[in-house]
């Protein structure tokens, strides 16, 4: 395994491998009935999200080929409560996929550092992992907060009508 990882690690393998590991890891978490523990976390607030450039990165994702990877995360049509709740659930699943992928991949990077890969490789792989996994976690959390605001506004309007 050591030889395979140290000789075959490249950025494309990193990104798509971590996505795959994230999907499997999240599936295992769902099967273990511990998924509820991962549903409503906010690791950073809106101000830091903006300062880190996560929203600009989100624009880049939406306007590049990467935006094609998860069509379930696009809201189309008229705004209604059920669609927003489903979109939030899909975003939570995607967020957890990226979080699990980030943790597993960063663990592999640290393991490879102990195995003797160059420091520039550790730094490069870590930056790639942060951008393509952790930033996507932050982006999903930001979007979920926006959905929560819309849902609470709709609920308040419904209470006023009643």
Question: Where do the PLM segments sit?
Answer:
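Long, highly hydrophobic alpha-helical transmembrane signal-anchor segments
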Residues: 1-42, 97-115
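Alpha-helical transmembrane segments of integral membrane proteins
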Residues: 2, 6-14, 85, 89, ...
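Generic structural hydrophobic/aromatic packing signal, biased to beta-strands
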Residues: 20-21, 87, 143
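Membrane-proximal soluble regions of multi-pass membrane proteins
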Residues: 28-87, 153-162
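Loop-to-transmembrane boundary segments
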Residues: 79-101
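Hydrophobic transmembrane alpha-helices
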Residues: 100-145
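Cytosolic/matrix-facing juxtamembrane and C-terminal tails of multi-pass cellular membrane proteins
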Residues: 138-162
């Amino acid at each position: 395994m050591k030889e395979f990882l140290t000789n075959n690690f490249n950025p494309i393998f990193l990104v798509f491998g971590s996505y795959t590991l994230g999907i499997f890891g999240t599936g295992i978490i769902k099967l273990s009935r511990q998924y509820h523990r991962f549903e409503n976390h906010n690791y950073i607030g809106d101000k830091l999200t903006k300062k880190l450039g996560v929203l600009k990165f989100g624009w880049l994702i939406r306007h590049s080929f990467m935006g094609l990877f998860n069509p379930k995360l696009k809201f189309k049509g008229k705004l209604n409560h059920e669609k927003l709740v489903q979109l939030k659930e899909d975003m939570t699943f995607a967020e957890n996929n990226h979080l699990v992928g980030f943790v597993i991949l960063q663990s592999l990077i640290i393991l490879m550092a102990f195995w003797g890969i160059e420091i520039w490789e550790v730094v490069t792989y870590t930056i790639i992992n942060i951008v393509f996994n952790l930033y996507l976690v932050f982006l999903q959390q930001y979007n979920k907060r926006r959905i929560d605001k819309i849902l609470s506004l709709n609920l308040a309007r419904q209470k006023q009508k009643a």
